[in-house]
UniProtKB/Swiss-Prot annotation:
Organism annotation: Synechococcus sp. (strain JA-3-3Ab)
HAMAP family named in the record: PSI_PsaB (MF_00482)
EC class of the enzyme, as a word: oxidoreductase
Binding-site list for chlorophyll a B3: 673, 681
Gene transcribed to yield this protein: psaB
Protein name (database record): Photosystem I P700 chlorophyll a apoprotein A2
Cofactor: binding details: PSI electron transfer chain: 5 chlorophyll a, 1 chlorophyll a', 2 phylloquinones and 3 4Fe-4S clusters. PSI core antenna: 90 chlorophyll a, 22 carotenoids, 3 phospholipids and 1 galactolipid. P700 is a chlorophyll a/chlorophyll a' dimer, A0 is one or more chlorophyll a, A1 is one or both phylloquinones and FX is a shared 4Fe-4S iron-sulfur center.
Length: 745
């Protein structure tokens, strides 16, 4: 093993001995790239990563505890529970010695108590839904989370000790890990959550307090466990809450605990709590069964290696003979590559996070939250951006897998090798789809702008999204008059067995046709255009990422690319022909496309909902069909309140968002300085600054040992991208929150 370096970074003797500031930048950049550290073995790599998972969980629990604690300490939770639609939830108090009298007044809510920050996280709604009612409940939760964080920190430390370090074979035992994750993590946690909803949340929603003092003695259902053991489970669905049920009281409450109602509670405008308990119980059963499917020590169940080996349709069947070796070789390829596993996990989590954004408002699970428009907008935007980062990360680690871990011999002629073999077809198809979407969508928008500008708006090209309307109608939306499937009571979807036994959720049709609901919003020509603009963004981002990954090992222009590693700069033909970019450069380009695409997604969602919330849907419908409409009637019009947060006449409670809006723009613009200027400029700038520093009295008392050198090209791009990203998100966050909050008071 190499001798440990005596100064930062201790994990790299090579970097630690570098006489320039490169030591610091590269040290920070590679601190988490454990694979490249001195003396790293595969077993130590897995052990270190395993321990970091515990540290990561500890940080998450600590952060969550802080949120809960500050709401209990400085929030207004108990007052809010008494009037959830009339009181603004408080995240925490603000103490700032620079606040003048006007600022103190602006950020103090009616009733006094000093300046506070409004909560747009949705936590209040979650607490209320799951049965927490007092600050004491919140303090107990915060302390519980702190204790959990301590347990996880200890577990992380423990698993680094020689006696408790798992072996490499333990980490490579895929079947056991899959069983544990399916049954132990997903299954049992879903069962526990169903238990909490049934034993605590549902009784609290009906005005019956359940706490640590009585939860073991309070029956959640009058019939107890008798229906469970006599297989008379339908009893638990009988007598659900009525449409007149008043949240938190016995008025209009039923006794059911596991229902299949569908739709929303009209009082809270959220999913029925008893439906959600049923859902989690069903998920628990499915996952606990799934967690017993794979073969471990007992010689029963599936072997994933055997399944993958046999996963190849024989000749004469559909796709027969078209997959080569099929999935042979994939078991070891996936099981021996952490990057492959991480790429799969990030892709799945990215999709799930985007679905959460969508479902959290359309099928709102939290009581009264759909009436808090700012929180709805903040949560949608937050989850869509996170989904974007996760998806780009999935492709990045997929590319690193291909550079570092892919073994062509072990994957001969299997599906993975065949994807690489016909990458030209994949890339060219994505390319023409992107070109088609881009030119046609932009062409329609620009045509419509010209018609508006020339005074002939009736000549706009407006296309009804008939296929999307058909899909909405088939799910039961009546507004289009299409009479298809669920929107036609005589269709086979409505009458086929066993639907006469009322298998369709009875509340679904009412919910999807509620003019004030958010399920399957009515769509028209503006939606058609922006859907295709978003499709352009998604396909172009995918094109860049897929090309970057599939060309990561080599390409026509640069067949030996894998020998250069994952990240090298595209710097023109003068530096040895790195024109054909590295996978890192593809990731870098894709980040801009991802951010812009999610910009369009959130612009669309926000503008459409502002119209619904304000009762003026015509503005979106009429002005979203041309570009000036988006710039003028969405961005400019909704910035008006925001940029008047402070002006020559004073300030109001939007001032902090106005300041953040400006600050976000400045951070974003700073990024361009790094993105546009190349390396020579930075080196000259640094030399000049060092020269001035060394000749300035007092300043020249401070010296540094490392010789200052400019950032590398890749580092300059990274710094530029970081500023662009952070500034972009800060700017839009301030815009969404301030514009929505100003409209909804």
């Amino acid at each position: 093993m190499a001798t440990t370096a005596t100064r930062f970074p201790q994990f790299s003797q090579d970097l630690a001995s570098d006489p320039t500031t490169r030591r610091l930048w590269y040290g920070i950049a590679t601190a988490h790239d454990f694979e490249t550290h001195d003396g790293m073995t595969e077993e130590r790599l897995y052990q270190k990563l395993f321990a970091t998972h515990f540290g990561h969980l500890a940080i998450i629990f600590l952060w969550a505890s802080g949120n809960v604690f500050h709401i209990a300490w400085q929030g207004n939770y108990e007052q809010w529970v008494a009037n959830p639609t009339g009181v603004t939830p408080i995240a925490h108090a603000i103490w700032d010695p620079q606040f003048g009298k006007a600022a103190v007044e602006a950020f103090t809510q009616p009733g006094g108590g000093g300046p506070v920050n409004a909560a747009y996280s949705g936590l209040y709604y979650w607490f209320n839904t799951i049965g927490l009612r007092t600050n004491g409940d919140l303090y107990a939760g915060a302390i519980g989370l702190l204790l959990l964080a301590a347990v996880f920190l200890f577990a992380g430390w423990l698993h680094l000790q020689p006696r408790f370090r798992p072996s490499l074979s333990w980490f490579k035992n895929a079947e056991a890990r899959l069983n544990h994750h399916l049954a132990g993590l997903f299954g049992v946690s879903s069962l526990a959550w169903a238990g909490h909803l049934v034993h605590v949340a549902i009784p609290e929603s009906r005005g019956q307090h359940v706490g640590w003092d009585n939860f073991l003695t309070t029956l959640p259902h009058p019939a107890g466990l008798k229906p469970f053991f006599t297989l008379n489970w339908g009893v638990y669905a009988q007598n659900p809450d009525t449409a007149n049920h008043v949240w938190g009281t016995a008025e209009g409450a039923g006794t059911a605990i596991l229902t299949f109602l569908g739709g929303f509670n009209p009082n809270t405008q959220s999913l029925w709590l008893t439906d959600m308990a049923h859902h989690h119980l069903a998920i628990a059963v499915i996952f606990i069964v799934a967690g017993h499917m794979y073969r471990t020590n007992w010689g029963i169940g599936h072997s994933i290696r055997e399944i993958l080996g046999a996963h190849n349709p024989p000749k004469g069947t559909p796709f027969g003979g078209l997959l080569g070796e099929g999935h042979r070789g994939l078991y070891d390829t996936v099981n021996n590559s952490l990057h492959f596993q991480l790429a799969l996990a990030l892709a799945c989590l990215g999709v799930v996070t985007s679905l959460v954004a969508q479902h959290m408002y359309a099928l709102n699970p939290y009581v009264f939250m759909s009436m808090d428009h700012t929180t709805e907008a903040a949560l949608y935007t937050h989850h869509q951006y996170i989904a974007g980062f996760l998806m780009v990360g999935a492709f990045a680690h997929g590319a690193i897998f291909l550079v570092r871990d892919y073994d062509p011999e072990a994957n001969k002629n299997n599906v993975l090798a065949r994807v690489l073999d016909h990458k030209e077809a994949i890339i060219s198809h994505l390319s023409w789809v992107s070109l088609f979407l881009g030119f046609h969508t932009l062409g329609l928008y620009v045509h419509n702008d010209v018609m508006q500008a020339f005074g002939t708006p009736e000549k706009q090209i407006l296309i009804e999204p008939v296929f999307a309307q058909f899909i909405q109608a088939s799910h039961g939306k009546m507004i289009y008059g299409m009479d298809v499937l669920l929107s036609n009571p005589d269709s086979i979807a409505s009458t086929a067995w066993p639907n006469y036994g009322n298998v369709w959720l009875p509340g679904w049709l009412q919910a999807i046709n509620d003019p004030n609901g958010f399920l399957f919003l009515p769509i028209g020509p503006g939606d058609f255009l922006v859907h295709h603009a978003i499709a352009l963004g998604l396909h172009t981002t995918t094109l860049i990422l897929v090309k970057g990954a599939l060309d990561a090992r080599g390409s026509k222009l640069m067949p030996d690319k894998k020998d250069f590693g994952y990240s090298f700069p595209c710097d023109g033909p003068g530096r040895g022909g790195t024109c054909d970019i590295s996978a890192w450069d593809a990731f870098y380009l894709a980040m801009f496309w991802m951010l812009n695409t999610i910009g369009w997604v959130t612009f669309y969602w926000h503008w459409k909902h502002l119209g619904i919330w304000s009762g003026n849907t015509a503005q979106f419908n009429e002005n979203s069909t041309y570009l000036m409409g988006w710039l003028r009637d969405y961005l400019w019009a909704n910035s008006a309140q925001l940029i008047n947060g402070y002006n020559p006449y004073g300030m109001n409670n939007l001032a902090v968002w106005a300041w953040m809006f400006l600050f976000g723009h400045l951070v974003w613009a700073t990024g361009f300085m790094f993105l546009i200027s190349w390396r020579g400029y930075w080196q000259e700038l640094i030399e000049t600054l060092v020269w001035a520093h060394e000749r300035t009295p007092l300043a020249n008392l401070i010296r540094w040992k490392d010789k200052p050198v400019a950032l590398s090209i890749v580092q300059g791009r990274l710094v530029g991208l970081a500023h662009f990203t952070v500034g972009y998100v800060l700017t839009y966050a301030a815009f969404v929150i301030a514009s929505t909050a100003s409209l909804s008071g």
